[in-house]
Amino acid sequence: MFIFQDCREGSQFTESGDTMIFKFEAQAPKIDEKAYAFNTATLIGKVELKEYASVWPGVTIRGDVNRIEVGRYSNIQDNSVLHVADKYACIVGDYVTVGHCALLHACTVEDHCLIGMHSTVLDGAVIGHGSIVAAGAVVTKGTIVPPNSLVAGI
């Protein structure tokens, strides 16, 4: 495990071979003992992985200026990025699948959703309960997707 004292202080760290976990401005990620993060995933700052959440190879979850939550039984697949904005946190509900190479930026994904591979969900967007965002789709800033919807295209 890489644990930096603070991202802004330089390269003080410890290594034990697991996930890269970084503090940011004294905020360290919180990982439930039943959650899993692959050893090439990077978790930074105000990040919480809840019970049975999983994070896979190459994922970056950066809670620097706001918080990120990954809900129970949710999975963030290979090379996806979750980030925040000053105004918006990034919240992933329970039982959510985020496909490979997706970008979730300062948005909310409610429970039981599927976010397709290479899709993008932007600031302030809300993906309603049980919805699907198709592979490659772009959900623009501030879009509210109703529950049980399918989103495709831009």
Predicted feature residues:
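Glycine-rich hexapeptide-repeat left-handed beta-helix
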Residues: 19-31, 36, 58, 64-94, ...
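N-terminal glycine-rich anion-binding loops that anchor highly charged ligand groups
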Residues: 44-50
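Short, Lys/Arg-enriched N-terminal segments with co-localized hydrophobic residues
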Residues: 3-19
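Compact, Lys/Arg-rich rRNA/RNP-binding cores from ribosome-related proteins
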Residues: 41
